[in-house]
Amino acid sequence: MKSVCGVLIILVVLTTMLSISTFSTVGAEGDCPISEAIKCVEKCKEKVEVCEPGVCKCSG
C-alpha cells in the first residue's frame, strides 16, 4: 500500500513540474493558478497558448 501512495505522489510532482516548465517555455502571461495550469496541460497537452484564470487556449 505504501508503494501505491509513493507512485501517486511522484506522479503529482512530475505533472506539476511538467506544467510549470511548459508554461515557462510558452511564456504564459498573467497569473495562472496551478490548478488551472494542470487543467490546461491535460486539455492541450503541450500546445498551451494562453493560460489565465478561467481562460485556457490551445495553440494549433
From Swiss-Prot:
Gene Ontology CC annotation, any one: extracellular region
Keyword Disulfide bond appears in the UniProt entry: yes
Q: In which tissues is it expressed?
A: Expressed by the venom gland.
Query: Disulfide bonds, which pairs?
Result: C32-C51, C40-C56, C44-C58
> Which Gene Ontology molecular-function terms are recorded?
potassium channel regulator activity; toxin activity
Record's subcellular location: Secreted
User: What superkingdom does the record give?
Assistant: Eukaryota
Signal peptide range equals 1-28
Q: Which UniProt keywords apply?
A: Disulfide bond, Ion channel impairing toxin, Neurotoxin, Potassium channel impairing toxin, Secreted, Signal, Toxin, Voltage-gated potassium channel impairing toxin
Query: Which family does the similarity line name?
Result: Belongs to the short scorpion toxin superfamily. Potassium channel inhibitor family. Alpha-KTx 29 subfamily.
Q: What does this protein do?
A: Weakly inhibits the Kv1.3/KCNA3 channel (1 uM of the toxin inhibits currents by 13.2%) and Kv7.1/KCNQ1 channel (10 uM of the toxin inhibits currents by 27.7%).
Question: What does the entry's free-text domain comment contain?
Answer: Has the structural arrangement of an alpha-helix connected to antiparallel beta-sheets by disulfide bonds (CS-alpha/beta).
Annotated protein name in UniProt: Potassium channel toxin alpha-KTx 29.1
Q: Which organism is it from?
A: Lychas mucronatus
